[in-house]
Amino acid sequence: MKISSGAINFSTIPNQVKKLITSIREHTKNGFASKITSVKNTHASLNEKLKTGKSSSIEFALPQKIKDFFQPKDKNTLNKTLITVKNIKDTNNAGKKNISAEDVSKMNAAFMRKHIANQTCDYNYRVTGAAPLPGGVSVSANNRPTVSEGRTPPVSPSLSLQATSSPSSPAEWAKKLTDALLRQKAGETLTAADRDFSNADFRNITFSKILPTSFMKRDGDIIKGFNFSNSKFTYSDISHLHFDECRFTYSTLSDVVCSNTKFSNSDMNELTLQYSITTRQQPSFINTTLKNTFIRHKANLSGVILNEPDNSSPPSVSGGGNFIRLGDIWLQMPLLWSENAVDGFLNHEHNNGKSILMTIDSLPDKYSQEKVRAMEDLVKSLRGGRLTEACIRPVESSLVSVLAHPPYTQSALISEWLGPVQERFFAHQCQTYNDVPLPAPDTYYQQRILPVLLDSFDRNSAAMTTHSGLFNQVILHCMTGVDCTDGTRQKAAALYEQYLAHPAVSPHIHNGLFGNYDGSPDWTTRAADNFLLLSSQDSDTAMMLSTDTLLTMLNPTPDTAWDNFYLLRAGENVSTAQISPVELFRHDFPVFLAAFNQQATQRRFGELIDIILSTEEHGELNQQFIAATNQKHSTVKLIDDASVSRLATIFDPLLPEGKLSPAHYQHILSAYHLTDATPQKQAETLFCLSTAFARYSSSAIFGTEHDSPPALRGYAEALMQKAWELSPAIFPSSEQFTEWSDRFHGLHGAFTCTSVVADSMQRHARKYFPSVLSSILPLAWA
């Protein structure tokens, strides 16, 4: 019985076979525009054969488009192809299981895979790892008997993919991968062949340009289960992608940009992995193997799976190279330890945290033996390079930051070589940071450098007192660093006890002021005066201060107080009222000098002094006024008749009728860049200048308890009056303004102490416009 393709009569065919033919027809017409041209039964009635359990054959002809894939000699044998249906007994559409579209697709794809790959090979296909195809269906070709024993080939690709030629360019490979990923993203289950990109060529491909942005996002889409074995990624950019359960065996990833690329649960054995210099953020390897893989020295291997190395030879690279083993990984080493090689391979502090030291150390502690062996090989190489101290000097910090920690301290070879390096590093730290603040310690410094410095002070206890500036900073950061371990804090506290017991220190701590007031530090509060710095010039002089004060003086802000400490001589507290902070820091405690001077240069009060008292006309007075700003109290007083007269001669022309002259007012605006400022901003500046001149007239500077220079009082009041005219809103109230004005002039029985006025005005400015006050008021008066 022959039935035309346009009107196939399915009435005599069981339901399962109907579904099979319909599915094959639907599946093939999309890929190859093929049509089933005939369906016929053989010698006996199809229904009769199905009833008796015998095999029946349904024949359909392959379209010409498929035949064209085969050699001419094989084409004649492909005219007829059988789909054999075995042991289908149910003719009443009540079979236990119909043939699914998925099973039909697999059958059809298996048929095409075998014929395209082998052309004349017959086989019996079964779904890998599953039960036989429904209804006992198998696929055969060329009218040959089917093989009764089922084999288990790899999961086969879809018909459409295998029936096309392989991509011939990186762009075509990129398109093929994009198509596969989009299908997978859409929910389609890809076969192994769909995910087979072995021998692919992705050279110079920037994946962010071909893939949806969702693949580059954190916790975005994942490239999962793909086979990239023996593929080329040279000069490609795979940044921010996540490859999971992928295979890269024997692939080449040379000069590849892989910033923040994630490889998880993947096979990356036997490949070349060389990052491009434009890789800013290291890739990560999670539960990934790198057996015999060649890796450059800048990598993070925290999630790598190491195994015992085999006897394979080191990889060969262009230009040659030296290598060391890290477990079963090959790490690149320089051919020669030149200056550039030392910096590039060892100086992670100069190379964004990347070096061969950090690469080895990035492995988890369970690989301690492998890490130590690799570091020993590195040290042997350095020792063999006969590097000079000058060559090692720039990388001393990087070396001790890794090698001075466990597990490398357990190696006698490493410790012997590192000892002199650590000594030179410590000497340089003492020389550099005893008189200047340490850089603000980040996590790296707290966890890797501070413990090394503690160990060095422990070995050289004399340095605690000879370099107390550095020692106190180290203890400070160990006790306050949020990333310091408890072990580091405990060791720091123990070392400080040794320091306090030193004869040069102990006389200063039994005065009822130190720590918990009985001579012991109190580490439970940052307000306790636990720190004691020795003078760099006078062994009898020391400074006692709290944790908070020490921190703020080392890293000051405009509001930092520079007198919140005890100055001790022979253990006794002495007044700092008439001591210039800048001179004290320059002579005795230089660790604060740079920070103090930096803040002082931001104070612009001196510009008004230069306007009023030019150095050409009033050189001596100018020096006296400037010198007074460097201390809280002045021994120079300007209340004698000659001084009062001289000051009146200078200030009276600036204050016609007791108010600022227009010309002088414009000079002030110009000096402080306020010409185009708002009235409120001008008023705030004038208010703060008034505060400073009120201080000049007080008993603390040029006045006494009973008298003060009238010209300075009048000038301070004139500045305040102008501020009121410009913006009354900056004052507490009109009543407060009137009270301050009366105090300046002694009117209405007001108390005339300008120290009280200066303090009151200063408190108000600090509360409502602190930045303006901090830009003007001298540090010693703050």
UniProtKB/Swiss-Prot annotation:
Ubiquitinated in the presence of host E1 ubiquitin-activating enzyme, E2 ubiquitin-conjugating enzyme and ubiquitin. It catalyses: S-ubiquitinyl-[E2 ubiquitin-conjugating enzyme]-L-cysteine + [acceptor protein]-L-lysine = [E2 ubiquitin-conjugating enzyme]-L-cysteine + N(6)-ubiquitinyl-[acceptor protein]-L-lysine. GO terms for biological process: protein ubiquitination. Its main location: secreted. Residues 157-170 have a biased composition (Low complexity). Residues 140-170 are annotated as: Disordered. It is an enzyme of class 2 (transferase). GO terms for molecular function: ubiquitin-protein transferase activity. SUPFAM superfamilies: Pentapeptide repeat-like. Keywords: Secreted, Transferase, Ubl conjugation, Ubl conjugation pathway, Virulence. Its EC number is 2.3.2.26. InterPro entries: SopA-like_cat (IPR025725), SopA-like_catalytic_sf (IPR038270), SopA-like_central (IPR025726). The keyword Secreted applies. NCBIfam families: PRK15377.1 (NF011904). Belongs to the SopA E3 ligase family. This is E3 ubiquitin-protein ligase SopA. It comes from Salmonella agona (strain SL483). The lineage of its organism: Bacteria, Pseudomonadati, Pseudomonadota, Gammaproteobacteria, Enterobacterales.
